[in-house]
């Protein structure tokens, strides 16, 4: 049986917040930050819901190294 995603709760909170605020990300920054904090606590690949943030970080690093 697969393990429960450790950051699933935070991802669900983001969905609830977005739905309650007409999908305005600016209104949900606090809950988005909580998910980022959760993702930072676990190794890469441990949480499926964190994969978007991991990809975002990889792209930022690639842009930095390419602009030198």
From Swiss-Prot:
Motif range (Cx9C motif 2): 28-38
Pfam family, one: CMC4
GO CC, alphabetical: mitochondrion
Family, similarity comment: Belongs to the CMC4 family.
Gene expressing this chain: Cmc4
Domain (CHCH): residue spans on this chain: 4-46
Location, primary (coarse class): mitochondrion
Positions occupied by motif Cx9C motif 1: 7-17
Reported tissue expression: Expressed in many tissues.
Disulfides per UniProt: 7-38, 17-28, 39-50
Coiled-coil portions: none
Keyword set, alphabetical order: Disulfide bond, Mitochondrion
Keyword Mitochondrion: yes
The record's note on its domains: The twin Cx9C motifs are involved in the recognition by the mitochondrial disulfide relay system.
Subcellular localization: Mitochondrion
Gene3D superfamilies in the record: CytochromE C oxidase copper chaperone (1.10.287.1130)
Protein name: Cx9C motif-containing protein 4
């Amino acid at each position: 049986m697969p393990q429960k995603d450790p950051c699933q709760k935070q991802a669900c909170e983001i969905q609830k917040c977005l739905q309650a605020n007409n999908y305005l990300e600016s209104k949900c920054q606090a809950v988005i930050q909580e998910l980022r904090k959760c993702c930072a606590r676990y190794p890469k690949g441990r949480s499926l819901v964190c994969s978007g943030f991991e990809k975002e970080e990889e792209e930022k690093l690639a842009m930095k190294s390419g602009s030198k």
